[in-house]
From Swiss-Prot:
This is Venom hemolysin-like protein 1. Its main location: secreted. One of its GO terms (cellular component) is extracellular region. Keywords: Secreted, Signal. Residues 25-50 are annotated as: Disordered. It comes from Platymeris rhadamanthus (Red spot assassin bug). The lineage of its organism: Eukaryota, Metazoa, Ecdysozoa, Arthropoda, Hexapoda.
Length: 240
């Protein structure tokens, strides 16, 4: 539910162009959102203050949602005997958080900036790291398959981050598709491990605990970067 709410907030920042892919598919052109009405007197309204108010509201909303998810993850890890089921839930949460904030940053275009893209990629990598941990503790071909998914997902996030930071005003839709793909792979892998490994061992539990610590640390780091986004918005000349 919270992830869906994040996506609603992401809608506030829609501003991207179509981007072709290898399979010939392209992403449609979403229309650029109009800033919300300002309650100040019209004589004091400026483009800068309106934009900063809009972005600040969106960032605060997303930040609150992410922090709520982080608290849930921390509490869950403290429960004895969580096993693979809780580990899969935490892994999926990491994917949702990372892709959600990554989309918000990318689709915000130049208004959000490279710092937001970096924050989203950082958090997405926390989820990918947990997927990789599953691969380390699983036997044979299953473990190798899981690690292959993690490696590929990591490369996709890096590519989306690099493209987004380099040409923010042009590739919001490209980054959006990349992050969504990673999100689905994280969830699929976590669910597969959850159903395949149906017993609790000390090694699995240890992996979950270590992964959860990494996840929550990544969330805290991302929250700090989100707070900096608004502070680093530079006033732009208001054109007639």
């Amino acid at each position: 539910m919270q992830y869906k709410l994040i996506l609603l907030v992401v809608g506030l920042f829609q501003a991207s162009l179509a981007y072709p892919y290898a399979d010939g598919e392209s992403v449609p052109h979403p229309s650029k959102d109009v800033a919300p009405p300002d309650t100040q007197d019209s004589s004091t309204q400026t483009e800068v203050t309106t934009q900063k108010g809009w972005i600040k509201q969106g960032v605060e909303t997303i930040t609150g949602m992410i922090k709520g998810q982080a608290d849930i993850a921390k509490d869950a890890v403290g429960i004895a005997g969580t096993g693979t089921h809780m580990g899969a839930k935490i892994t999926s949460a990491a994917g949702e958080l990372g892709t959600g904030i990554g989309n918000a940053a990318l689709q915000g275009g130049l208004q959000i900036g490279a710092m937001g893209v970096e924050a989203g990629a950082n958090l997405a990598h926390q989820g990918i790291g947990l997927v990789d941990k599953w691969g380390q503790i699983l036997p044979g071909f299953l473990g190798k398959g899981v690690q292959s998914v993690a490696n590929l997902a990591g490369n996709i996030v890096d590519k989306a981050e690099n493209i987004g930071k380099g040409v923010l005003e042009k590739v919001g839709a490209a980054g959006d598709k990349g992050f969504k793909w990673v999100d689905s792979k994280i969830k699929d892998t976590a669910n597969s491990v959850d159903t395949t490994v149906n017993h609790i061992t000390g090694k699995i539990q240890e992996g979950i605990d270590k992964g959860a610590n990494t996840l929550t640390g990544g969330i805290d780091n991302t929250l700090g970067k989100l707070k900096d986004i608004v502070n680093n918005i530079r006033p732009k000349p208001v054109t007639a």
